[in-house]
A protein has these predicted regions:
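C-terminal nucleotide
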Residues: 2-18, 23, 31, 39-86, ...
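Residues that flank catalytic or metal-binding motifs in active/ligand-binding sites
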Residues: 13, 36, 291
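DPxDG-like acidic metal-binding loop motif
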Residues: 34, 117-142
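Short aromatic/hydrophobic contact patches that present stacked aromatics
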Residues: 118, 294-296
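Short pre-catalytic strand/loop immediately N-terminal to key active-site residues, enriched for Gly-Thr
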Residues: 110-117, 282-284
Length: 332
């Protein structure tokens, strides 16, 4: 069944406020959707092809009636867009009969999410693509979209907890537990942060493996760190609800020290976190996988302009004001 020939959807980026890496092993994390988004349009075309175009410069096409395998004779563009192709193929094959499957889908992607700095651009693109393509054929609820987006994202990050896709789908501040009961955290006012992009690229896969090796070699220590991370998350959820930025900032800095112990931070990141604290931030920590990437700082509202200027003067890093937004996936 075809509902419409053209569909659009957008999904937000995210920041991890607390609990990255530990969430993979069952500890909670707190994530928030932010005011940066990926926008996807999908339309029915007559050739039985899946065509994917991105404003990052990648363009690739696949045949609908063939499920390609990742890594087998694919061009660089096809490898880059493979998770989106996989998600689209799954939606089409589950929505159409054999006759209708002779149709194809053309997908256009536009993003204002910086890539590769820990903001969940991969998850957001999967969520928006599944939503846009799915809406061509049937009305789909958010849980259906989340499940298929996470399946596609795991082709990129095999150990993904699902947190990125979940917060991108449902929006807001989420207390997230892998395979557990998740809940939204209600706040009295919007939470805003300064995100500092170090420009240092990282491999999420390599960092996840590093943490896995650390856990295997230091089981007792890892368990202690995970328990501390859980306690920090629980206290942070209370601080967010109570609108207590001083307490929240201290908890952010404690979380960063746990990540230092895991070995996923870098000297540049640690120096940046210390400078943020010395410059008046309530708290600061790396966000995402680590290995460079980005730092988030919680800064008094009246000091944000001066804070950003000082950081730019000291490090020349890109400073991005971000705000936690209550809305996640949007369909048009």
């Amino acid at each position: 069944m075809i509902l419409t020939s053209l569909s659009r959807a957008s999904a937000p980026a995210k920041v991890v406020l607390f609990g990255e890496h530990f969430v993979v092993y069952g500890s909670p994390a707190i994530l928030g959707s932010i005011d940066r988004r990926i926008r996807v349009s999908a339309q029915i075309i007559r050739p039985p092809q899946i065509i994917i175009r991105s404003d990052t410069g990648f363009s690739a096409s696949f045949t609908v009636n063939k499920l390609y395998e990742c890594g087998t004779n694919l061009s660089e563009a096809q490898k880059f867009t493979y998770p989106l192709y996989f998600a689209t193929h799954e939606v089409i094959s589950g929505s159409l009969n054999a006759k209708a499957a002779k149709l194809g889908v053309e997908i256009d992607i536009h993003s204002d999410i910086p890539y590769g700095i820990g903001l969940g651009s991969s998850a957001a693109s999967c969520v928006a693509t599944v939503a846009a393509v799915g809406s061509l054929f049937l009305k789909r609820d958010r849980h259906w979209i989340f499940t298929r987006a996470h399946r596609a994202e795991r082709l990129i990050h095999k150990s993904s907890s699902g947190g990125d896709c979940y917060v991108s789908t449902f929006g807001g501040l989420i207390y997230y537990v892998r395979n557990g009961k998740n809940r939204k955290i209600k706040t009295r006012r919007s939470v805003s942060l300064i995100l500092v992009n170090t420009g240092i690229k990282h491999s999420t896969k390599a960092l996840v493996s590093l943490v896995e090796n650390f856990r295997n070699q230091n089981t007792s220590l890892f368990d202690d760190l995970a328990n501390s991370a859980t306690h920090i998350c629980d206290q942070a959820a209370l601080a967010l609800t109570e609108d207590n930025p001083v307490k929240l900032g201290r908890l952010m800095s404690r979380n960063h020290r746990l990540l230092e112990t895991l070995g996923v931070s870098t000297e540049e990141t640690d120096n940046l976190v210390r400078y943020c604290l010395d410059s008046g931030a309530y708290g600061a920590k790396l966000t995402g996988a680590g290995g460079g990437g980005s730092v988030i700082a919680l800064v008094p509202d009246e000091y944000k302009t001066e804070f950003g200027y000082k950081l730019l003067k000291k490090y020349s890093y890109q400073c991005i004001p971000v705000q936690i937004r209550s809305y996640g996936l949007l369909k048009y």
